[in-house]
Amino acid sequence: MRRTFAIGDIHGCSSLLAELLKRISPDPQGDTLVILGDFINRGPDSRGTVELLLELKRQFRHLILLRGNHEQMLLDYLDGRHQGLFLAVGGRETLASYGADPAAVASTSWLPPEHLALLADLPTCYENEHGIYVHAGLQPGVHLTGQSPEWLLWARDDFIRSNHDFGKRVIFGHTPFADPLVTANRIGIDTGAVYGGRLTCLLLPELKFVSVAATGSYSWGRHQR
């Protein structure tokens, strides 16, 4: 059975991602690596994070990069929508990592084409024998194929508090916890790396957690979008 390594929200903490990958050492040919979205914003090195993801894409046969709400907000920003929201929730840090001016809303020239192509073509969910993987959560009682982007990218309490059986465990990020949340129907692995917590990987089927502790905090509060 192929192992799956699932990694929570990175938020521009590229050095933590690099260190975590060294610790878990997944097999690029045999293992599946799933990263649950929110690669960018808030942290110091969104550009370096995307560059590392592109390198992983070249290395791994089974790499799944999921869309998070922050990738969606970047795409909206580039499309001229919700610009203030993007900048307020860490977009300024992303732009700074690319050496870009927040005033250059209408232009994508600051974003390398390979980076834009990766960020614009991310699925919102993935399923394998070990579980269902999403950024934020699922709407109880709705089949996976009928889930809305609002739930997949933005869900919080209504999903987290639900006892609904989704058929498989749901592996998710988005909502930070001090330690991974483990229940019968879901596992939350956002452990607040950008807030001074940890970047966490879940190894399946072993149900083992591996984390790298942050050395500082790059954002002032939790549960902001």
Place the predicted regions along the sequence by residue.
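Acidic, His/Gly-enriched loop-helix segments that form or flank divalent-metal centers
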Residues: D27, L87-L199, L204-R225
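Core catalytic region of metal-dependent phosphoesterases/phosphodiesterases
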Residues: R3, I7, G12-L85
